[in-house]
Amino acid sequence: MGTLGKAREAPRKPCHGSRAGPKGRLEAKSTNSPLPAQPSLAQITQFRMMVSLGHLAKGASLDDLIDSCIQSFDADGNLCRSNQLLQVMLTMHRIIISSAELLQKLMNLYKDALEKNSPGICLKICYFVRYWITEFWIMFKMDASLTSTMEEFQDLVKANGEESHCHLIDTTQINSRDWSRKLTQRIKSNTSKKRKVSLLFDHLEPEELSEHLTYLEFKSFRRISFSDYQNYLVNSCVKENPTMERSIALCNGISQWVQLMVLSRPTPQLRAEVFIKFIHVAQKLHQLQNFNTLMAVIGGLCHSSISRLKETSSHVPHEINKVLGEMTELLSSCRNYDNYRRAYGECTHFKIPILGVHLKDLISLYEAMPDYLEDGKVNVQKLLALYNHINELVQLQDVAPPLDANKDLVHLLTLSLDLYYTEDEIYELSYAREPRNHRAPPLTPSKPPVVVDWASGVSPKPDPKTISKHVQRMVDSVFKNYDLDQDGYISQEEFEKIAASFPFSFCVMDKDREGLISRDEITAYFMRASSIYSKLGLGFPHNFQETTYLKPTFCDNCAGFLWGVIKQGYRCKDCGMNCHKQCKDLVVFECKKRSKSPAVSTENISSVVPMSTLCPLGTKDLLHAPEEGSFIFQNGEVVDHSEESKDRTIMLLGVSSQKISVRLKRTVAHKTTQTESFPWVGGEMPPGHFVLTSPRKSAQGALYVHSPASPCPSPALVRKRAFVKWENKESLIKPKPELHLRLRTYQELEQEVNTLRADNDALKIQLKYAQKQIESLQLGKSNHVLAQMDHGDGT
């Protein structure tokens, strides 16, 4: 970043696509050098082309331009003059006339030459068409009307018995030529040495991250063809332009990914660490001369959802803020991106421009200059200016990037950047992290200072097959790097670290084997966690309905009490989440639908099962909890009063996917104490603690459970309090001991694990028995239906 100051001291040089104002000219004259500023390379190229065109550069009719192109070939098909007019005419003719109409004019000239018995002219016309097919074959593959007209031209030539001419205008060679694979060929790295990189976001160095982002950016940028730029000029949008739309979507995806990665950290210190890391990534991107991704990263860091985080910014050093200010000034839109244009003009070799800025230049040039001059001639200078501008962007695709990308990390980034959120959703997440106050609703997000307008409103249009392909590639990379014993499983700890590379994940992992995750489970996880998947209608939104609660209930979003006589709040019919009316639209937890088992809602529980029936969340083949921090009780069981059931241990799976072991003893409390104050009323709840208590519990029975910070905390927003609702019929008859928490020995933990495993095995046996009964009943039902049908046929 030390070069930014020097760049500001350098005299300004006029660059293409922008007009130097009076102030810029005065500054150029006030330098010590008596010589005027040197023209840019694009200006020199345009001047040389105008000289080579001669009188045509001042303007010419369309027929004169076509005739000059035909006369550029000799009798043997070789160019007898500069090919610059051919290049300009064949690439930019769509501004004046469509490709099919241009070929139709050539057909008419061919017919006239046949009538005048001029075989030389016919041959030159075919040479011109062959040059068109060879150099700009993509037009014949993308333009259906041009292909249809070409077939008519070929039939015309065949009808006149000109076999040699038919070979010249043959288009079957398009699919067999090597250059037809230009758009899909791989990027060649400058280094042959293979290096192993980590797939964990926290372990990735800024240099590695910037190189792989540059790889993805260049891969998308080099697929934009000359025709794509033409289509953008003609349509003034990226509609029906998939390559350019994907490039824009990648830029927006990187910007949103940066915001969400910062917001995914639960504490201001951790958010500041991610913020600082992306500043270092931006510095590396500037060194790589990747201005487009640099714009996306800085735009994400300057977004209002990040800049409003005052607590986070207080942990960012002054030096980092200074670097951010320099980057923001470099990419500022002031004076038509003057700082960026000067820095970009000084770059040589590999560089990726800010595509939006140059597309705006193309549109400005296209709208400012007329297509025709006053005498009806074609404005050749406009065609030249547009051609030079587009050709400069296309030539950048031939310079290989100075980096070596890791395929596995590319797959991981490709999937993680596919996440898509709206501006309002991101701002709600920011507001949930650092609320301004408890009453004010979230404001409408403001535009970031460095994000260009052309990129807004462009959303990716994926399909399930594309998402599935990205997920499968990423999963293959994960197991290749982390499944060293090749048993088809990775550990829970490794998975949590890998999942930290994704901004927000909303589902709890099931495990076929304790502490291990299979390939199918991790694939299902990322398919479900994909935000685009949710946008396709396959997500899990809440189904809130206004509800009247018969018992005191708390809001699962803000932990506040639901006041009122009737219709106190809203309840999700699928997962059972309760919340205030004002909290309904602020809930960021994904709906986790409950399995249709004979479970009883928390409002209607009249009996409690032994504590051994409580099962840990995330354990496969057991009851699935509807949401984090809640329990499901089976109905119809008899309360066991043995010593074994009085003192049990349950396993809670917190929002960071780490297990919290809690030793509980059965307790009772009067049901009228739900709204009494807790010991910390008037102060803040102790940090690092979850609150586990019954809503019917008195203040003396509050239980504190220490929860150490996870090395890779989950991005899911932590609720202020989690309540376990349970009660006992005997609570009105005989009081029981209070809830108790103590540290346990290793032997006790081992005994508890063995007990839980035995309970798990017993439940599996019961489940298999129930499944067999269901199958037998279904078979009996089918036989009964068939018997009735046979009886009906007999009668």
Swiss-Prot record:
Xref: InterPro entries: C1-like_sf, DAG/PE-bd, EF-hand-dom_pair, EF_Hand_1_Ca_BS, EF_hand_dom, PE/DAG-bd, Ras-like_GEF, Ras-like_Gua-exchang_fac_N
N-terminal Ras-GEF domain span: 53-176
GO biological process entries: B cell activation; B cell proliferation; cell differentiation; inflammatory response to antigenic stimulus; mast cell degranulation; natural killer cell activation; positive regulation of natural killer cell activation; positive regulation of natural killer cell differentiation
Ranges for region Disordered: 1-37
Stretches the record annotates as Ras exchanger motif region: 57-110
Pfam families to which the protein is assigned, alphabetical: C1_1, EF-hand_5, RasGEF, RasGEF_N
CC annotations in GO: cytosol; endoplasmic reticulum membrane; Golgi apparatus; Golgi membrane; plasma membrane
Basic and acidic residues bias: start-end ranges: 1-12
Domain EF-hand: 470-505, 506-532
Gene3D superfamilies per record: 3.30.60.20, 6.10.250.2730, EF-hand, Ras guanine-nucleotide exchange factors catalytic domain, Son of sevenless (SoS) protein Chain: S domain 1
Keywords tagged on the record: Calcium, Cell membrane, Coiled coil, Cytoplasm, Differentiation, Endoplasmic reticulum, Golgi apparatus, Guanine-nucleotide releasing factor, Membrane, Metal-binding, Phosphoprotein, Repeat, Zinc, Zinc-finger
Region: PT region, residue numbers: 717-795
Zn finger (Phorbol-ester/DAG-type) location: 541-591
Single GO MF descriptor: calcium ion binding
Residues involved in Ca(2+) binding: D483, D485, D487, Y489, E494
Main location: cytoplasm
Domain Ras-GEF, residue spans: 205-436
Modification type Phosphothreonine: residues: T184
Alphabetized SMART domains for the sequence: C1 (SM00109), EFh (SM00054), RasGEF (SM00147), RasGEFN (SM00229)
Membrane-protein topology: Peripheral membrane protein
Free-text function comment from the UniProt entry: Functions as a calcium- and diacylglycerol (DAG)-regulated nucleotide exchange factor specifically activating Ras through the exchange of bound GDP for GTP. Activates the Erk/MAP kinase cascade. Regulates T-cell/B-cell development, homeostasis and differentiation by coupling T-lymphocyte/B-lymphocyte antigen receptors to Ras. Regulates NK cell cytotoxicity and ITAM-dependent cytokine production by activation of Ras-mediated ERK and JNK pathways. Functions in mast cell degranulation and cytokine secretion, regulating FcERI-evoked allergic responses.
Domain observations: The phorbol-ester/DAG-type zinc finger is the principal mediator of the targeting to membranes and is required for functional activation through DAG-binding.
Family: Belongs to the RASGRP family.
Protein name: RAS guanyl-releasing protein 1
